[in-house]
Amino acid sequence: MAKKPIYKSLYFQVIVAIIAGILVGHFYPSTTHVVDGVKEHIPGLGEQLKPLGDAFIRLIKMIIAPVIFCTVVSGIAGMESMKSVGKTGGVALLYFEVVSTIALLIGLLVINIAKPGVGMNVDPASLDTSGIAKYVASGQSQSTIEFLMHIIPETVVGAFANGEILQVLLFAIMFGFALHKLGDAGRPVLKFIDQISHVFFNIVNMIMKLAPIGAFGAMAFTIGKYGVGSLVQLGQLIICFYVTCLLFIFIVLGTISRICGFSILKMIRLIREELLIVLGTSSSESVLPRMLRKLEIAGCEKSVVGLVIPTGYSFNLDGTSIYLTMAAIFIAQATNTQLDVQHQITLLLVLLISSKGAAGVTGSGFIVMAATLSAVGHIPVAGLALILGIDRFMSEARALTNLTGNTLATIAVAKWVGALDKEKLDEALNNPAEVDRKMLEADRPAHA
């Protein structure tokens, strides 16, 4: 088979799109004019391209619920034993809790050593909090009980209509169990769901062709609205956060991957296209449907992939966990709020719960941060205004770390519950281009 020209690869197209987006945003930025003493915001071409990125994310979110439903149902209903489903869920939740706790601790450790907020001497009363009002309102409405109750949908249709991943996942698990109990009588339904999943994955392939356009629009908006110059003032926190994410990926996740018998670098190469799409869109959710199919081809059983990946988007957001601890302590440092060990332990315990409410979409981490500061009470919520402008620049590292963490979690859980084909995984890690080819072939309709 002739090798596909590089310009036709999604990998290359997304890189070009990101670079083009940065250039457009930089050379056609938004400006602010003062008219009669009133600041007037004039959006530049870069900011005006925001709908391109938003449209791509909406197209992906449109298909996530049915893809998850079909994947989970066919995975569970097709299993021989229901005990293995419970075992997989238990191992996954234990893994999520341990690894996300490590992520929170690493963020806490690094921010206390680097102290990027010390010396800013910001008076919380002087901050303009108008920009954070909607996040604070959203954050204050969340609680642990409400979050858990929210997992149970009021109606099945509502869960799908609103794109509530955990609600769809709960219904899919129940549907899969019920279908499994029917035995042979449920086979026609299972076959239909399996066939319709191919239709949904074909839609995903169609949408992914638009990924370069989405990445271009999202990147042009970010640079055009906030500008590269806006990074300078709070650059120390951004650098600190990016370095911490890299340390977490290559030390913590790297150690777990070695325990599982493979290299973290090879795994990153396997998901390089997805990482680039995430880099452009700042949302790890944008590649969720692709990851379901890719990890299945890479040797993980469908039932494991269907359970671990969607659940991980709420319970295993390592990048978001690092961000939450670092941002909270940074605000305390910048506003000269004294935090003793007891305060920091309280913050950690609150984050262990509140961080589970973040979804893999842009802005969710900021809402959880508002909820956390409101719950802790000691750190001024007004301090969120300090990081509002740079939050968008940190969302890329958050999303990339989240995706890497969830990919490893799926492979690790599959290995530990005996649901991993090691030969397929090795083949995928050594030849990622072949996996991408198989993904396209798997979703082509078979003609007799």
Swiss-Prot record:
Example GO BP: L-aspartate transmembrane transport
UniProt KW keywords: Cell inner membrane, Cell membrane, Membrane, Symport, Transmembrane, Transmembrane helix, Transport
Any one GO MF annotation of this record: succinate transmembrane transporter activity
Subcellular location: Cell inner membrane
A GO CC term assigned to this protein in UniProt: plasma membrane
Record has Membrane as a keyword: yes
Membrane topology: Multi-pass membrane protein
Pfam families attached to this UniProt entry: SDF
Keyword Iron: no
Membrane-crossing segments per the record: 9-29, 59-79, 91-111, 159-179, 203-223, 237-257, 312-332, 345-365, 367-387
InterPro entries attached to this UniProt entry: C4_dicarb_transport (IPR023954), Na-dicarboxylate_symporter (IPR001991), Na-dicarboxylate_symporter_CS (IPR018107), Na:dicarbo_symporter_sf (IPR036458)
Role this protein plays: Responsible for the transport of dicarboxylates such as succinate, fumarate, and malate from the periplasm across the membrane.
UniProt-listed PANTHER family: AEROBIC C4-DICARBOXYLATE TRANSPORT PROTEIN, PROTON/GLUTAMATE-ASPARTATE SYMPORTER
Family of this protein: Belongs to the dicarboxylate/amino acid:cation symporter (DAACS) (TC 2.A.23) family.
Name the record gives this protein: C4-dicarboxylate transport protein
